[in-house]
């Protein structure tokens, strides 16, 4: 057994006896971290999904960070939500939180910073006020008009960092505008089974970092 109840799943040993597999020790309430390492095509994904299938006896939510659509059929079979982050098959994402709350404003402030500034780049009070004013402005709009292309109109026209935002904007035909500049938001993580395919942006840190920031904010 483990602290969740019944053992996770059965394996047959070489002597044909039963091996009761767990990711936890008895009485251990810590997370059952595991690492699977083996050559390509050896069955890592199959084993992981088998473990997940058995773990559903305990309930809870699961999030699959996927590559090359490896888990899509599994997520679809269990009636989960599977998102593909790809400009040719884009899940429309609007990162601006729907409700104007203190917590949502704090997230949006940090998120906008991540779109404009490098992680080790310091900003001064003037730059901070530019972001705060833009957040005030976008929340003054009707909820259907809250997107990045409209948010940028609340920055000062001569702000020295304004041009850095263009890459994210459809209004500027930005290279990464497909990622976040949308009126709609289809990035709904309320299903108990979520799969997200990151194949297209795994090597694009400029897009990947803010996407992960948004993802973990919504999970929490």
Where are these regions (language model features)?
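Short coil/loop residues immediately preceding or within conserved phosphate-binding loops
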Residues: 31
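Hydrophobic anchor at the beta1->P-loop junction of P-loop NTPases
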Residues: 36
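P-loop NTPase motor domains
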Residues: 1-19, 25, 69-72, 76-220
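Hydrophobic positions on the alpha1 helix immediately C-terminal to the Walker A/P-loop
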Residues: 47
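Walker A (P-loop) phosphate-binding loop of P-loop NTPases
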Residues: 41
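Post-Walker A helix-loop "phosphate-sensing" segment adjacent to the P-loop in P-loop NTPases
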Residues: 53-63, 78-81
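Conserved lysine of the Walker
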Residues: 44
């Amino acid at each position: 057994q483990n602290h969740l109840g019944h053992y996770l799943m059965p394996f047959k040993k070489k002597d044909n006896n039963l091996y009761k597999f767990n990711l936890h020790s008895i009485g251990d309430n810590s997370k059952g971290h595991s690492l699977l390492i083996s050559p390509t095509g050896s069955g890592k994904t199959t084993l992981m999904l088998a473990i997940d299938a058995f773990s559903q006896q305990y309930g809870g939510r699961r999030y699959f960070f996927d590559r090359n659509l490896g888990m899509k059929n599994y997520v679809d079979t269990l009636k989960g939500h599977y998102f593909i982050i790809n400009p040719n098959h884009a899940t429309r994402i609007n990162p601006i939180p729907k409700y104007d709350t203190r917590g949502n404003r704090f997230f949006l402030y940090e998120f906008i910073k991540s779109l404009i500034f490098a992680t080790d780049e310091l900003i001064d009070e003037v730059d901070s006020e530019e972001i705060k004013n833009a957040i005030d402005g976008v929340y003054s709009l009707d909820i259907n008009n809250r997107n990045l292309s409209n948010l940028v109109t609340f920055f000062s026209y001569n702000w020295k960092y304004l041009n850095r935002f263009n890459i994210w904007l459809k209004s500027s035909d930005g290279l990464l505008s497909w990622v976040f500049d949308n009126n709609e938001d289809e990035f709904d993580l309320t299903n108990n089974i979520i799969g997200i395919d990151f194949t297209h942006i795994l090597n694009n840190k400029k897009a990947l970092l803010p996407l992960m920031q948004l993802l973990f904010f919504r999970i929490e």
